[in-house]
From Swiss-Prot:
PROSITE patterns: GATASE_TYPE_1. InterPro entries: Class_I_gatase-like (IPR029062), FGAR-AT_N (IPR040707), FGAR-AT_PurM_N-like (IPR055181), PurL_large (IPR010073), PurL_linker (IPR041609), PurM-like_C_dom (IPR010918), PurM-like_C_sf (IPR036676), PurM-like_N_sf (IPR036921). It comes from the Bacteria. One of its GO terms (biological process) is 'de novo' IMP biosynthetic process. Transmembrane segments: none annotated. The keyword Protein transport does not apply. This is Phosphoribosylformylglycinamidine synthase. The active site is at C1137, H1262, E1264. It comes from Mannheimia succiniciproducens (strain KCTC 0769BP / MBEL55E). Monomer. In the N-terminal section; belongs to the FGAMS family. It catalyses: N(2)-formyl-N(1)-(5-phospho-beta-D-ribosyl)glycinamide + L-glutamine + ATP + H2O = 2-formamido-N(1)-(5-O-phospho-beta-D-ribosyl)acetamidine + L-glutamate + ADP + phosphate + H(+). One of its GO terms (cellular component) is cytoplasm.
Length: 1297
């Protein structure tokens, strides 16, 4: 039964204005446009009046927007037919958890109503439709009733065979094209030979499985190939040269090259998690460090948001599936694209070169892709702390002559770190008879052939196969799966997981064979046991689809009951689909058709397939130096500040949660002005320690257009000069991930790849003592297409991205680029590892003048690089550095500018001692760093530099001033003189333009104005209480511990740090899942307090916190239980972020909350992750006693934090009752509604509220993430261990005496 429910308006006024502007630009005669949500319900039976009312209440969410009459021509945008959106999965979950069992499935669309000035032609209709939907993910129908097609059910399809016994190799060649298998010629020979020997034809599913498992993407054939270069056989494969780094420096590596991620030694710390009895405790143990970096380039080119989202999701699964289960912790992302060509902001170096229609533009990729990557990390609950962004697209003379080099096929980088227990680093044994399980969501007909598709040059596959390889993200599902994995590894030796892999490229067709093969087993499987949301799928589609958020596991039969219980508690779907066998044979049975779609020996699938030989020739490049004739320094500087690789990247950073876990010690944003210039990301190893982990990135791809090896060396070296800013110690503690992107087969590129790998694996890394225990390759970085009968090609430069990871001794010693003006007399020093060469080839300067140059920067002296690292480590350890920033993209002038921006100060630099060529001195990208030291420490610093052989490379640069100036002189001659604030504005223009396109332009304008304001005072803190006083200490001393329910729903992700804050305040913190209350495993009557935690319950579907709250309100027993708890006079309750939204929705059952608002989408219409300044008001709130009059920063991470009242009298009522506990304030400590000081646009800056009795508080910011000083992005230097917000938790303990 199909039913339609009208929803609220879908687009705000500024979104409608943006859409109208696009129509106008496209010359479409649109007179008016209105859009509203439509909800479609697939019902097993008709709903009663009460059920209909409940469902309508569920489907009422979002901000109140102006409603219009639905008139004009209707176009309804729905999910692509044959797919199920992640919104649908979550909304359906909510309906079921609210008791609406007749709902089979919910889906959502947007109905657009247009009035036109004249009738549209068919071509105009097509253009109109292209502006309102994403063809890769959505379909347009002309009437709401036509959306019923979403729920059409078909009979299962059988497998097909390819007749090679009669048709021979030719039959396989046809299947290779039609199925998009990307099989090589020798692989086709191998398959024909082996199936002929078996005496049968292959089934389509078997061929598909073989193609995925043996694709370049999965098998890394080029990195394992034999090489002949210029007729000379090479001694080693690429992979052997990478492995050489481990052979030379195995120190501190616990696992390399054999698992989903590499593992190195970590620190012994108190890991905080809930035991099996539910109580949170510290566990003193080794927290070893795992690391992984992936790329997801092809899917991001085709459909940027889901491509980047599932890129991050897949890498997170790699971490969680390491060993016998691990914990992902912090992430990084990166993007390389062609020129942006932002309308109205076109730059002199940008030409609007063409692209094929099947791929997204660079601008679209950088609008949608980062949102996808951030959204997945946010919803999963992993802070994204590091990244890079490069644009390149230019016709240059390189190794293949003059041609266009660029990133039409983008790089989308996703990586991170995690932690793992010592006993779980290695996989276990898979016993015969072990249950083979898929953990996670159902199979869907999406993401088919991703492994093979990503191994092809863009443009070589059929366009319908590009559609098939688009994936769908559901991070909230992955979070549920991770919670199960966490419960498993937290059981220590009792961990029920024997073996685990993630499901990625190739789906189960790759994951399950890999699982049993790695365990030395075979497997018998039942196809119809696989959870499947689409009945009509064929065996190939069920087995080979790449539905995300899935893991495959082996669990011994005796441990199965424990595992199932954990899954049920976390509401994580799972299916037992097979058993491990002694014989290494793979059988897949299909109950529906009673046949075997797969019946193969494992040796055929994963055995000795033909080994590749690369017989290639090297080429030379012959270029001219950068022509400096018409380059004026000021203009050059302004251009470079606007180049994306240099420009401020706030638009890529504040969309990503950077505080979740409460263990982030250094994110991108630096200092009181929160400038995104940090060289390194740093986390604490646990919530009770200053030991930690660090990550950095190094990448210099354009250099490869001149010198392959130099580009690779610079990438490694830059990762070291970046990570040197924190307290690591021995360089052997640093481990690298190498991600290689190349257009294999393109003239000169193969030999260049070999040269680059050799430079890293055989030479530089062994010399430095560095190991590369993990990495990834993407060998098809080329886009070809035909345009007006002409063949076009855009080829990416060889691109090596190095990610460096290390254990940190003391996270507090990390040095930032923020120049200090409050430390007395100081000096600026340049340590020039380029030894004065100042080469300009392949620099930002060359790029902005459409040049390439001849000689690029390079590692001049390996020993000096090592000495530099050791010297910086000594100075970091001794606390001698006030500021540190490496020289990289843009050169010395950018290094100095970014340091001045971070310090909101002036610079007077003197460059006479650095050489004769101003452009070379200021814009060369040679290795090095600028440091700021106290005059009183100068002698000691020079002594350390002398000891490490660097004193002859150390140059005095000049002074830091308190003025709004940026001056560079050569003797008495002024080379450049500008206002720092004006340069700050130029540097911010890219972010401003991107935010105006993507977000609310009014918010973008407000933030841009704040950045340029020379009077901006930055953050400050003033506390009216003693930060070091533990007001709860006398009550903790009694030994009594009030019990607090740390409440979470599926998708909540901030519960562990919340438990830690209450544990420190003297509570017995208990992990309580909503499923515990539903099943009566727990009851709120047994608790003194409850806290509803932050995150993304149900992925914020049906309104943030709304689904969670309504699962209480629509369940009589739960509603009564919560109401009784709130009405008791001996209880406290706190709601933070998602918990704030949830508890505000429960206002009807909480005394004294009649004036509470609901929380709706931020004014920016963007997830906002920032440090924000708040002021505490006088109130009767138990939680905020003694804090009134204080102001201090706090972590903010939400997309729906704006208060919305039913009427003005509610707001006035809150004011009159004194229930507004805290407000966002500007840097002058005035309550504000101006963005971004007020990140969500709430009236009066409202951000925390109390009920009338003071026992219930709700707040959107996250005090639990900053209860330790070290986890604040900025804090006054006199704060010690406890942060300012620890007082809130201790106040709660005082209440219970």
């Amino acid at each position: 039964m199909f039913q339609i429910f009208r929803g609220s308006p879908a687009l705000s006024e500024f979104r409608l204005n943006q859409l109208s502007a696009r129509f106008q630009k496209a010359d479409l005669p649109v007179k008016s446009c209105y859009a509203e949500y439509l909800h479609f319900a697939d019902l097993s039976a008709g709903l009663s009046a009460e059920e209909t009312d409940e469902l309508e209440q569920l489907l009422h969410y979002g901000p109140t927007l102006a409603q219009h009459e639905s008139k004009g021509e209707c176009f309804v945008v729905i999910p692509r037919v044959g797919t199920i959106s992640s919104w649908s999965s979550k909304a359906t979950d909510i309906a079921h958890n609210c008791g609406l069992d007749k709902v089979v499935r919910l889906e959502r669309g947007i109905a657009y109503y247009f009035e036109f000035e004249r009738t549209l032609s068919a071509e105009q209709q097509q253009r109109l439709v292209s502006h309102i939907h994403d063809r890769m993910m959505e379909t347009v129908v002309r009437a709401p009733e036509q959306a019923a097609v979403l729920f059409d059910s078909q009979d299962p399809k059988p497998f097909t065979t390819v007749d090679i016994l009669n048709g021979g190799r030719k039959a396989l060649e046809i299947a290779n094209v039609e199925l998009g298998l990307a099989l090589a010629s020798d692989e086709m020979d191998y398959l024909v030979e082996n199936f002929t020997a078996l005496g049968r034809n292959p089934n389509d599913i078997e061929l598909y499985m073989f193609a995925q498992a043996n694709s370049e993407h999965c098998r890394h054939k080029i990195f394992n190939a034999d090489w002949v270069i210029d007729g000379e056989k090479q001694e080693k494969s690429l992979f052997k040269m990478i492995k050489n780094t481990f052979e030379k420096t195995p120190d501190h590596v616990l696992s390399a090259y054999k698992d989903n991620a590499a593992v190195m030694e970590g620190s012994k710390v108190g890991r905080f998690f809930a035991d099996q009895d539910g109580q949170y405790r510290y566990h003193n143990e080794d927290a070893h460090i795992l690391m992984k970096v992936e790329t997801h380039n092809h899917p991001t080119a085709i459909s940027p948001f889901p491509g980047a989202a599932t890129g991050s999701g897949g890498e997170i699964r790699d971490e969680g599936a390491t060993g016998r289960g691990a914990k992902p912790k912090a992430g990084l992302v990166g993007f390389s694209v062609s020129n942006l060509v932002i309308p109205g902001f076109e730059q002199p170096w940008e030409n609007e070169l063409s692209k094929p229609s099947r791929i997204s533009s660079a601008l679209d990729i950088m609008i949608e892709g980062p949102l996808g990557g951030a959204a997945f990390n946010n919803e999963f609950g992993r802070p994204a702390l590091l990244g890079y962004f490069r644009t390149y697209e230019e016709k240059v003379n390189s190794f293949a002559g003059e041609e266009v080099r660029g990133y039409h096929k983008p790089i989308m980088l996703a990586g991170g770190i995690g932690n793992i227990r010592a006993e779980h680093v290695q996989k276990g044994e898979i016993p015969v008879g072990a249950k083979l399980i898929v953990l996670g969501g159902p199979a869907m007909n999406i993401g088919l052939g991703g492994g093979a598709a990503s191994s092809m040059t863009s443009g070589k596959s059929k366009e319908d196969l590009d559609f098939a390889s688009v994936q769908r993200d559901n991070p909230e599902m992955e979070r549920r799966c991770q919670e199960v994995i966490d419960r498993c590894w937290q059981m220590g030796e009792g961990n029920p997981i024997a073996f685990i892999h993630d499901v990625g490229a190739g789906g189960l067709s790759n994951a399950m064979p890999e699982l049993v093969h790695d365990g030395g087993r075979g497997g018998k499987f039942e196809l119809r046991n696989i959870l499947c949301d689409e009945r009509g799928m064929s065996p190939l589609e069920i087995w080979c689809n790449e539905s995300q958020e899935r893991y495959v596991l082996a669990v011994a039969p005796e441990n199965l009951a424990v595992f199932e219980e954990l899954c049920q508690r976390e509401r994580a779907p799972y299916a037992i689909i097979g058993e491990a066998t002694e014989e290494e044979h793979l059988t897949l049975h299909d109950n529906h058709f009673d046949n075997n779609p797969i019946d193969l020996p494992m040796s055929l699938l994963l055995g000795k397939t033909p080994k590749m030989t690369r017989d290639v020739k090297s080429t030379q490049v012959n270029n001219s130096p950068v022509d400096q004739t018409n380059i004026e320094l000021k203009e050059a500087f302004h251009r470079v500040l606007r180049l994306p690789v240099v420009a401020e990247k706030t638009f890529l950073i504040t969309i990503g949660d950077r505080t979740v876990t409460g263990m982030v010690a250094r994110d991108q944003m630096v200092g009181p002005w929160q400038i995104p210039v940090s060289d390194v990301a740093v986390t604490t190893a646990a919530l009770d320690t200053y030991h930690g982990e660090a990550m950095s990135i190094g990448e210099r791809a354009p250099v490869a257009l001149l010198d392959f090896a130099a580009s690779a060396r610079l990438a490694v070296a830059e990762s070291i000069t970046n990570i040197a800013a924190t307290n690591i110690g021995d360089i052997k503690r640093i481990k690298l991930s190498a991600n290689w992107m190349s257009a294999a087969g393109h003239e000169g590129e193969d030999a260049g790849l070999y040269e680059a790998v050799k430079a890293v694996g055989e030479e530089l890394c062994p010399a430095l003592g560095l190991t590369v225990p993990v990495g990834k390759d993407s060998m098809s970085m080329k886009t070809t297409w035909s345009e007006n009968g002409e063949q076009k090609t855009v080829t990416a430069p060889l691109s090596l991205v190095i990610s460096a990871f290390a254990r940190v001794e003391d996270v507090r010693k990390t040095v930032t680029p923020q120049l200090r003006t409050d430390k007395g007399e100081t000096a600026l020093l340049l340590i020039d590892l380029g030894e004065g060469k100042n080469r300009l080839g392949a620099t930002a300067l060359a790029q902005v003048y459409k040049q390439l140059g001849d000689k690029p920067a390079d590692v001049v002296n390996v020993e000096l690089l090592k000495g530099f690292y050791n010297a910086m480590q000594t100075l970091v350890q001794q606390g001698k550095l006030l500021a540190y920033h490496d020289r990289s993209d843009g050169g010395l002038i950018v290094t100095l500018a970014e340091m001045a921006f971070a310090g909101n100060c002036g610079i007077r630099a003197e460059i006479s001692a650095l050489g004769d060529n101003d452009l070379g001195i200021l814009f060369s990208e040679e290795l090095g760093a600028v440091i700021q030291v106290r005059e009183s420490d100068l002698a000691a610093v020079r002594e350390v530099l002398t000891q490490h052989g660097l004193i002859h490379l150390t140059k005095d640069l000049g002074l830091v001033t308190e003025y709004d100036e940026f001056e560079i002189k050569r003797g008495t001659k002024v080379v450049l003189s500008e206002k720092r604030s004006e340069l700050r504005g130029i540097w911010a223009e890219l972010t401003h333009q991107m935010q105006r396109l993507r977000d609310n332009p009014e918010c973008a304008d407000q933030e841009f104005a704040a950045k340029k304001d020379p009077a901006n005072q930055g953050f400050s803190a003033h506390l009216t209480y003693d930060i070091n006083e533990d007001v709860a200490a006398p009550y903790i001393a009694t030994g009594k511990k009030p019990r607090i329910a740390v409440l979470r729903e599926q998708g909540v992700n901030s519960h562990v740090e919340m438990g830690a804050a209450f544990d420190r305040a003297g509570f017995e913190a208990i992990d309580v899942h909503m499923s515990d209350l539903h099943t009566a495993r727990q009851n709120l009557k047994d608790f003194n307090a409850l806290v509803a935690c932050g995150g993304f319950s149900y992925g914020d579907v049906l309104g943030a916190g709304g689904g969670w709250a309504k699962s209480v309100l629509f369940n009589t027993a739960l509603r009564d239980q919560f109401q009784a708890f709130f009405e008791r006079e001996d209880t406290l309750a706190l709601g933070v972020c998602n918990g704030c939204q949830m508890i505000s929705t429960l206002a009807d059952i909480i005394p004294g909350t009649e004036n509470w608002p609901r929380f709706v989408r931020n004014t920016s219409e963007r997830f906002e992750a920032r440090a924000a300044l708040v002021r505490i008001n006088e109130s009767n709130s138990v939680w905020f006693q003694g804090m009134a009059g204080s102001h201090m920063p706090i972590a903010v991470s939400h997309g729906e934090g704006r208060v919305e009242f039913k009427n003005d009298s509610q707001l006035q009522g809150l004011r009159d009752q004194g229930l507004i506990i805290a407000q966002y304030v500007d840097n002058n400590i005035r309550p504000t509604e101006v963005y971004p000081a007020n990140p969500n646009g709430s009236v009066d800056g409202i951000t925390a509220l109390s009920n009338t009795n003071g026992r219930v508080a709700i707040m959107m910011p996250h005090p639990e993430r900053v209860f330790r000083t070290v986890s604040n992005s900025w804090h006054p230097e006199d704060w010690s261990e406890d942060g300012a917000w620890m007082r809130l938790f201790r106040n709660a303990r005082v209440f219970f005496k």
